[in-house]
Amino acid sequence: MLNKKIADMLNEQVNKELYSAYLYLDFANYYEDEGLDGFAHWYEIQAQEERDHALMLRRYLIDNGVRVTFGEIAKPDKEYKTHMCPLEAGLEHEKYVTSLIAAIYRAAFDEKDFKTMQFLDWFVKEQGEEEKNADDLIKKMKLFGGDSKGLYMLNQELNARVYTAPANAADRSEERRVGKECRSRWSPYH
């Protein structure tokens, strides 16, 4: 069983990750309206990743005997005046999420909850990647976005992005799907 403070913080993070997915779908809607389907596609994949993060946190809580409760998900309240606005808002949001993960990590350290710290190591690394990806996209937009041909090419590049589920989440899902009673002698899950 997890420490109550850590469990509460992780449970709240589930909700924050779901909000992130909601926010990125809002960005995708904006870009669809603007005729930038590649940008929309990129943020649809971002939304899927955030949902995956929520599910990973949820599973960790459940596996540690914690009842997961969901809070309200706030409606994104932004209007985007330029194509750059969602990109900048996305970077700021990723920095915010990084600070939330860091706070949970710090609390786990203070409580000597090494198991949770190890679990969160993946999220710490992931947040570094998320911030870099958001920053790189802003740099590309500044470089190419002012020119219609450049914007078209960037849109095409973003449209080629392929969704990849986190390896540890996929492995855990497969383990649950197969189930102990269904494993054969050749199963890698012995």
Label the predicted regions:
Residues 1-177:
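Iron-associated oxidoreductase/ferritin-like identity signal
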